[in-house]
Amino acid sequence: MAKIEFLNEITEIIKKRKLTQPENSYIAELVAEGLPKISQKLGEEAVEVVVAALAEDKARLVSESADLIFHLMILLDSKDLNILDVVKELDNRNKKWTSKN
């Protein structure tokens, strides 16, 4: 199973690009357009995941899923959250689920 520490690195990249707004930065451009645009892009990526699940191979599904998670990370950052907040929630749910068995 892959380790998830690299998610911290991606989170820091998102924060840095949001703060410094370098030229030619996709993250900076998306963040500058605001939450509605970030949300729209996340929705588009979600649709692409569904399409890949229904009509594409596994590699394409994994690729589109990575895009979805990346854009989710940008959205979470725009709400002063990060992916580790989601991981913690999943961990809490897992503890509840496993304690019931």
Region locations from a protein language model:
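Flexible "arm" and connector segments at domain edges
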Residues: 1-65, 69-101
